[in-house]
Amino acid sequence: MIGQEQLQTEIQKQIKRGVFPRFCILVGPRGAGKKLLAEQVSKWLNATLLPTGTSIADIRVMIENSHKLSGNCVHLISDADNMSVQARNALLKVTEEPPNNSYFIMTLEDENNTLDTIRSRATIFTMDRYRPKEIREYIEKKFTDITKDRVSTISIYTTLCETPGEVNLLNSMGALEFYEYCDKVVQNIAKVSTSNSFKIADKVSLKDGQEGYDLKLFLKAFVTICFDEVIAINDPENLEMGLYAQMALKTDEYLRELRNKSVNKQMLMDNWIMEIRDIWM
């Protein structure tokens, strides 16, 4: 596992002292390695890892099994940001008095995406941010075809990717082709007709399971390219420099909005296109 040394050390210390919590929440961005860390924790505890879903039915089955199973078990509730209120309420019951042989680990991208009462009963572990050096180390270990002499390609990864999981995602999309497309959008979004501008969304995945470029990475690339234009122009009196800066700042607002897991991505994309075009009008 790349990085997370301090967090791993802290968890191991708690396990050795016999004070590791029966219920904890791992918080971190997508692809940060939360599930991988949970797998590692189960090994340190000499426990069986039992992944479960987030539906009310899944939680009820998990609770029932937790009282029946013998031996140490780690029940892993992954990607629980969108868990229903009913499922969260069911989870409350078992986290209040966990069975002696059961540990419960929930993973979230944002700790606010669950009930206050659940947070109050859990020990929260926050994944450390990955440094560019660690992202580069991961790239060079996992993708041998991205060699050190391809500096431009590696810089795309280290600029856009916050986690190893995002490196995998960007690689699956084709980093260079993706970045070239984003640059094309930056240069032409205000020049094409309104109807053609909305075709930008055809290349972006706006629903789970839909093919296309990842929306978060697309917006991050757009911001990066806009700021590169600002640096290249480097003339405060140049009107375009200010417009590129406005596009970057406006897009960053949409990136923050995207953190809301219930956001309508299609609506967000349409609104973003209109606001970016308005900047140039």
Regions found by a protein language model. Give the residues of each.
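Clamp-loader machinery-focused feature within the broader ASCE/P-loop NTPase space
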Residues: M1-P99
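Charged, glycine-rich active-site and insertion segments that engage polyanionic ligands
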Residues: M1-G33, L37-N46, D110-A221, I225, ...
